[in-house]
């Protein structure tokens, strides 16, 4: 049996075909979405959990070495890895919020798969993280289906996050494919996420149209200009319908990070001065919220940065504010900070102003964020997104008849307004912002695996 599988930066979802239509399966708490989050007692617990409780093989030298190190470390630290030691989605977030200092938490593992300079042991770790999530998702799906799931059509961005170009894309897709097969899928095929989203929109068309699909996911923005219509639906070879692609490593997470940096970090002393009037360095505040950047987070939570923060508290004109950043460092609160920014961004989709409160840092710590504040904070990442739209059109040398906007950030009025200004007079259509890629993957799986 086949599934369409959107292993997303922000959320994961799975769909099957029933009576000719995609049907999304429940993943968590009666929702079809599983937030892309994972927690465990330690980083090493994940590898042992896969082996001990799910008989997932360590196929090569690096994964075997990682498993041996993990088992040894957990024994030395007297950590008992049980079947419930690894949690996913909102359950993992709840555990992290309850005890951030004692819970190892990861959001959006997909963000790191294309990172440059990963050592073999780091690649092996990310493969185990992805495998654990995919295994959990396959089990959730399997519990709702009578036949064994053996085939998966998995979405991938045009360009994964990372600076290595084709090499980064090869590395990231390789991690996904190996993880999927270790998680129990026998046949694994990939399709570009914007193409998949377009396939779901295509069933609504009565005639051929040039459709510009703009898919703003959690970690990437992908644009494809596609010929779509009834005559294309059942064709296995659609090469001639793909007019132009582009993709960048900017997505919803980057919007959240930018909003947190510009609007929340000043509450924690960013932009302040020392008693002598010297500006405080900005980098610690940026690294604190750059949750999709491995080196930045490693630097922020290093012992050396802890010493720097001590010095900044000592020298700052407003030491009580910088001490709040020190609390973020001490209690590992980066994810909660960015989550608060995300909640504010979502609220501003339907209101002119929202209050962002940070009681997990300090009881009364809060600020008002307006639409203008949001627009200012997001101007740089938004410009990058619009560049990709133009690049896809330049590659295609064609103009679209319609724009199909999808992805978690698609409901933002700010993005719709920017697209309308860039391409005036072209209608903007939308569908299931969180499910269109998954539905399209299920439709394409039916074509490929039938």
Where would I find each of the regions flagged by the language model?
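Early-domain small/polar-rich strand-loop-helix modules and first-structured segments
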Residues: 1-118, 251-281, 286-289
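Glycine-rich beta-strand-to-loop/alpha-helix junction loops that act as flexible
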Residues: 156-157, 402-410
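Conserved phosphate-binding/catalytic loops in two-lobed NTP-binding clefts
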Residues: 183-191, 416-442
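Phosphate-binding glycine-rich/basic clefts of nucleotide- and phosphate-handling proteins
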Residues: 35-40, 64-65, 228-360
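Phosphate/pyrophosphate-binding loops at sites that engage ATP/ADP/AMP, CoA/4′-phosphopantetheine
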Residues: 137-152, 385-402
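Nucleotide/phosphate-binding catalytic cleft detector across ATP-hydrolyzing
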Residues: 1-22, 93-213, 230, 234, ...
């Amino acid at each position: 049996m086949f599934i369409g599988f959107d292993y997303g930066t922000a959320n994961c979802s799975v769909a099957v075909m029933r009576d000719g239509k995609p049907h999304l399966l429940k993943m968590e708490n009666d929702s079809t979405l599983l937030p892309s989050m994972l927690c465990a007692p330690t980083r090493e617990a994940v590898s042992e959990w896969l082996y001990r409780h799910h008989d997932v093989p360590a196929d090569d030298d690096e994964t075997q070495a990682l498993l041996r190190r993990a088992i040894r470390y957990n024994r030395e630290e007297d950590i008992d890895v049980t079947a419930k030691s690894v949690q996913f989605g909102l359950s993992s977030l709840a555990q992290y919020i309850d005890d951030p200092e004692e819970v190892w938490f990861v959001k959006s593992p997909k963000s790191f798969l294309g990172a440059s300079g990963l050592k073999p042991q780091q690649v092996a770790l990310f493969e185990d993280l992805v495998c654990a999530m995919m295994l959990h998702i396959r089990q959730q799906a399997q519990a709702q289906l009578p036949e064994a799931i053996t085939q998966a059509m998995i979405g991938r961005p045009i360009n994964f996050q990372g600076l290595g170009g084709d090499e980064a894309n090869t590395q990231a897709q390789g991690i996904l494919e190996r993880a999927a097969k270790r998680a129990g899928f026998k046949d694994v095929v990939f399709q570009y996420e914007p193409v998949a989203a377009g396939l779901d929109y295509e069933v609504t068309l009565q005639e051929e149209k040039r459709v510009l699909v703009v898919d703003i996911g959690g970690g990437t923005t992908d644009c494809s200009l596609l010929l779509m219509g009834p005559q294309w639906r059942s064709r296995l070879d659609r090469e001639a319908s793909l007019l132009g692609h582009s993709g960048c490593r900017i997505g919803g997470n980057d919007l959240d990070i930018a909003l947190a940096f510009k609007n929340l970090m000043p509450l924690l002393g960013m932009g302040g001065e020392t008693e002598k009037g010297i500006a405080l360095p900005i980098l610690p505040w940026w690294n604190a919220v750059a949750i999709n950047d491995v080196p930045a987070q490693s630097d922020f939570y290093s012992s050396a940065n802890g010493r720097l923060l001590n010095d900044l508290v000592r020298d700052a004109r407003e030491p009580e504010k910088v001490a709040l950043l020190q609390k973020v460092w001490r209690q590992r609160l980066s994810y909660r900070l960015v989550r608060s920014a995300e909640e504010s961004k979502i609220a501003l989709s339907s209101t002119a102003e929202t209050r962002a409160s940070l009681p997990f840092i300090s009881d009364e710590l809060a600020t008002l964020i307006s639409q203008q504040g949001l627009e200012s904070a997001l101007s740089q990442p938004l410009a990058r997104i619009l560049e990709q739209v133009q690049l896809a059109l330049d590659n295609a040398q064609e103009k679209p008849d319609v724009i199909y906007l999808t992805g978690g950030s698609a409901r933002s009025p700010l993005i719709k307004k920017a697209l309308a200004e860039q391409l005036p007079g072209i209608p903007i259509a939308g569908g299931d912002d969180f499910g269109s890629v998954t539905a399209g993957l299920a439709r394409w799986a039916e074509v490929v695996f039938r």
